[in-house]
Every structure is written in C-alpha cells, then in structure tokens.
Amino acid sequence: MSADVSTTPAAENVNGAAEASPAPAAAAPSATTPEVTAVENSTPAPAANQPHSASLYVGELDPSVTEAMLYELFSSIGQVASIRVCRDAVTRRSLGYAYVNYNNTADGERALEDLNYTLIKGKPCRIMWSQRDPALRKTGQGNVFIKNLDSAIDNKALHDTFAAFGNILSCKVAQDEFGNSKGYGFVHYETAEAANNAIKHVNGMLLNDKKVFVGHHISKKDRQSKFEEMKANFTNVYIKNLDSEIDDDEFRKMFEKFGEITSATLSRDQEGKSRGFGFVNFSTHESAQAAVEEMNDKEIRSQKLYVGRAQKKHEREEELRKQYEAARLEKASKYQGVNLYVKNLTDDIDDEKLRELFGPYGTITSAKVMRDTNVERDQSPDSAGKEKEADKENDKEATPEAEKAEKAEEKPSESSEEKDKEAKKSDKKPFGKSKGFGFVCFSSPDEASKAVTEMNQRMVNGKPLYVALAQRKDVRRSQLEASIQARNTIRQQQAAAAAGMPQPYMQPAVFYGPGQQGFIPGGQRGMAFPPQPGMVMGIPGGRPGQYPGPFPGQQGGRGMGPNQQIPPNFAQGIPMGMQGPGGIPNGMGYPQMAQVQFGRGAGGRGQVPGMPMGQGMRGGPGYGQGRGAPVQQGQMRPGQGGRGQNAAAPAGPQEGAAGGVNAQTLGAAPPAQQKQMLGEALYPKIQAQQPELAGKITGMLLEMDNTELLSLTRKPCAPRSMRPLAFTMST
C-alpha cells in the first residue's frame, strides 16, 4: 500500500500529483489562490504539442526566500512579468512555493529546462508549469508511485531515471521535516501511456542496489476504503504478555486449533531470548477472529494474554493520538470554568495556605503552588555539623571496647517505624523556591466565579493577588499573538498619521494629561469605531469632518444649542497644526463629557465655558478684541468670548478634583465619562511620583475595575503601592 504525503495548495496548483507536495500550506487555506497574471490553458490535459502558458510553479522553497531572490534567478532567462511568493494570510509566512510569470512561453520553457532543481538557499527548487484548473490537477492520470527508494535518490536523480519514458510534469521524493528521504516518491507524466511504460520497465528493477516498486498512484480516498476493508478481514494476529519460557513450537500449538496457520513467530532479542510477544498469521479471517475472541485475556502460565489484530506502526500512532486527544478534550471540558490561576504569591504561601485562602468560597478539589523542582534543599549548619561528627566517628577503629561503649550508649528512644514515618513526612514536604503562582480547582463554576470576584486584587501579605480562570498554553499564546499584532497595527497607524497618510481605520480614544503623551484606554460604549490618537470622539449625529450642529467656522450656524456640550479639557493634548480657529481640531468631532453648555449667540462666536484659552483662540491670549489689542497671558476680560458667551458660566477651566469623585457622582455619570473622571483624579497623584510615565501608568491603571480605582483615589498613597505593577506593565 502506498504511503501518503500531505496535500497543499502547491500541489493543487500544478497537476494530478496532489500527494507529492510540501505540507506547510495546510495551516493557511485562505492563502491558496495566488495571483497569476499569465493566461492559463483550459484544455482537459496538457499535450506535448500544445503551447503552455508563461506561468511557472516553483516549489520546495526555503521560508526565507523572497520575490527579489527569485527575480534575480529567473530574470537571467528572460523578461519576468511578475513574481509572487505565496504566504499565509494571517502570519504572512512563506508557504514554500511561488509563481513566476514570463512575458512569453519560450522563456518559461527555457527556465523549466535550465533552472529546475537549482539550489536556492541550499534547497533544490522544483519547477513545473502552473495549472489552475483543479479538475485537471486531480485527475491522477499518468501519476506513478515509487517506493523502496534509496535514501541517496533525490528529486533530480528520480527525474533523470524516469525521464526516458516520457515528458514529466512533476517529480518529487517525499521528505521528513529534517529533509531526509522517506523512501518513496511520485512521478507525474504528461500521458497515461508514458506512465504505463515506466511501470512496465522499472517495476521490480534495482535502483542503487534496492528493488523498487513502481505502480499507479492510488488516491488517499481509495486507499482509505481499501484499508477499512483490510481491517475488517484481517488474518494477522498480535499476541503479547507471553511467558519468556514459551518456545516457537509451544507458541504455534497454542493457536493451531483455530485453523490453518501460514506463519507463527516469536520476537527475540540479540541474545535469542523471547521479548514476550509474537505474531500468528492465519489462512482465513474466520480463524483469526476465533483466535482473538477465545485467547484474548486468557491466563497462560499466570500471565494474562493480549490477543488482537496486528497493526502497523502508523496505525498504532494514529490510534494513540486520537486517544490522547479525546482524553485531553475530556479533561479540558471537565475543568472548564472551575480551575483558577493565582499569581503574585509570596514565598511563604504553600499548598495548605493557598487552600485556606480560597476555602471560604467553596469546595476545593485541589490547590497547588508551583515550585522550582531543580533546586535542592540546602543543608542547615546543624545537619552539616552532625554529618562531620558522623564522619569522624566512622574514622575510628572498630575495636571491641569501642563497640561495647556504643552498645552501652544506645537508648531505646525511637523505633524504626517511627523513623520511617518521619522520613516519609520529610519527603512529602515541598522543596524548591516558590514560583509565585499556583492553581486552585473548585467543584463548581459558581464557586470559582465567586472566588475570582472576591480574591482578585486582594492584598495578601502585602501583595495584590491576580486571580483568573486558568487557560491552556495554546490559548494564551494565541491571545498574546493577537495582542502583539494589534499593538503593531496601532504603531503602524500612528506612524502613518504622523506622516500624514490616510488611515484605513481609526484607533481608540486617547486620554491626555496636562502636558503628557496620551494613553489608549478601552473602547467606549456606543462608538461605531474609536478615533485616532490626538483626536477626540465625535458626537452621534455629526457629519464626518464637522461638529454636529453649528459651530465656529461652519456655515449656517447661529451658535450651539442648549444640549450641545464640550469637555472641560478639550483643547489640551491636541498636537500643534491640528487646531483650527478657536483651538478646535480641524475636521474632528469632540466627546460629550463635561456638562457645559453654550449660550445662544450670533455666529456661534461664544467662548466655551470651562475651556482653557489656547494660544490664538478667538477671545484668548494673543487674540485681541476688535483690532487685535494685546492681552497678557492668563488675563481674561468680561464678555471676551463674543456675543454668544453664557454670562452664568465660569471663566476659568473646570477640573474634576480628586476629592469630587465619589461613588454617587461616579454612578450618575455615563460609562464613557466614568473612566475620564477617575483618570483625572488619579493623574495628578501619579504625575507627582512618575512625571514622565504619568499618562501611560494612568492608562494601565484605568484597565482595573471602577470600584478599585475609586478606592485608589481616596487613598493618598494608594498609587504608590500600585506603581511597581503599573511601571512594569508600562515598560
């Protein structure tokens, strides 16, 4: 039976030798349709006298091969129209194959003849005509399977051997992950007659002193159905747990009563001793089935035998893999939602203390603190001194007087059983330094959820615990890759924004502290998509590039309505060059955060109450009244904002002081404003301790729950205790 090789888009893009392609593309089915600019033939099968397209498939490429490397090689043949290395749609890693398109077919024929099996980055490439029609690729006509190949035979040697029987479309020797030959390969001829001719002349011949088998390739589907039929009609029986004293004659007589035996053998080692298992092959399936049913689990010479159908190695490995996968899934579903991960533990917390901490929240099935098992227990000075004394005693001469003195000094203090118990207790004690994390498993998801709610961020021995549901390593890795990819995307968008390039999508809103770089909190509720850093969010109902309703600089406005609002620190943190008249960012919206209203005025020229006067603002410093009379920095005249200014509004900026944030005001505020209020309360405290990282650390802390943030605002030194954690996260 022919062996199987994983199929890939590379194989499907060439011809019927689907099983003769590399395996990397199986992880990225989304990248299976490369862009090939050349025109393809639509004939049922390529013939020798028909012109090919100018598109070539290049396989067996190293993952580091790029389009530039291929262009340097293939441009020596003729003018190259395009080159594309096919990559995974998600990771953008090379799938190991590419397409090279020439402007004319003659150059493609020369490249196929001259460059096939050329070394690229130390690996011989495999070149063939591209065939995009899947029906033509999967016909299998002319596909030949060769097995029992010598390990020295590579793709080129196999091609040279079988090229005498006809035009070869594809030729490949299967290799493992280390590049070693698996002992079989495939040759796809252009016609079925050439394939039959190769089978007739090469099958049973010697290649490098090894007799090879050459036959028509059987598809995986047909092989699978044939394999199932063979399993249902097995004749070969495997027996294990045999006594080592059983010889070949006795072994054969044990199974002769079930039917005619064609062969029976015991496996022996190099010394000729039985290895405890053997094989019996019957002439009929019924005899083999009867032997399995009667002899399985039967005791012979005090050993229970195992008798079953003989399996090949790959079949046993596949069965074990399925059993392991089923056990893993069962275990994962069993502990789904009940297993907790606890980190930031102090060194003095062991398994018992961890169980005591989480015991009040439910029934704990297991609790374990992970420790470094490679660290051996250090010997105490007392034990070291006792060992030295024992060594000195052992150095004494064993005289009769000394033996009598030792017997006289012996006391019936402890029995050997008590000593054994103490030794067992000492062995059970955990050794090695704590890794600072552990796991707690509850009996129900409700108990685990309650423990997460109550114990997360709780201070234990001066350190806040981190408690969350335990996740598998592959899940954590995928989440980490997703977060890294999102972070890289944000950096790319920021770089593009700095260069003035258009953005494909907008980024989360940024909280700006006074004179600080902004940080990026989570997305706000109600936002269709978050705005760019350095920008502020638009109000629902506004058109892109404009503020909702009339505003200075827009047409058709007589001032803002009474329900239109603007934040108190609106102008702070906006980069230079992005402000329009009045300090407003050009073409950008603003969030509804501060409850400050405009008064109705002509032309909408009113000063925004509670908004700091920016340089160059209408009515602000540097912008004079009437003919531009100068106003000193920090001064403000009554009525300076124009006719639309609200007389009852305060002239200075309004700030949310830390003392003004309490649970009542926080609960009354909308969710989008709560984080802003807490950030404004925490920012001054953190800025006093970390001026350079104040904005970033504040952003990190705002990822915590609002109740915890509220408690931090009430404690003057609370941010100091959180500083190491936030500082670590920020770096």
From Swiss-Prot:
The keyword GTP-binding does not apply. Residues 658-731 form the PABC domain. This is Polyadenylate-binding protein, cytoplasmic and nuclear. GO terms for molecular function: RNA binding. Belongs to the polyadenylate-binding protein type-1 family. NCBIfam families: PABP-1234. It is found in: Cytoplasm; Nucleus. Residues 1-10 have a biased composition (Polar residues). Residues 54-132, 142-219, 235-312, 338-472 form the RRM domain. The keyword Cell membrane does not apply. The lineage of its organism: Eukaryota, Fungi, Dikarya, Ascomycota, Pezizomycotina. Its main location: cytoplasm. PANTHER family: RNA BINDING PROTEIN. InterPro entries: Nucleotide-bd_a/b_plait_sf, PABP-dom, PABP_1234, PABP_HYD_C, PABP_RRM1, RBD_domain_sf, RRM2_I_PABPs, RRM_dom. It comes from the Eukaryota. Disulfide bonds: none annotated. Keywords: Cytoplasm, mRNA processing, mRNA transport, Nucleus, Repeat, RNA-binding, Translation regulation, Transport. SUPFAM superfamilies: PABC (PABP) domain, RNA-binding domain, RBD. Residues 17-39, 645-656 have a biased composition (Low complexity). Residues 616-627 have a biased composition (Gly residues). GO terms for biological process: mRNA processing; mRNA transport; regulation of translation.
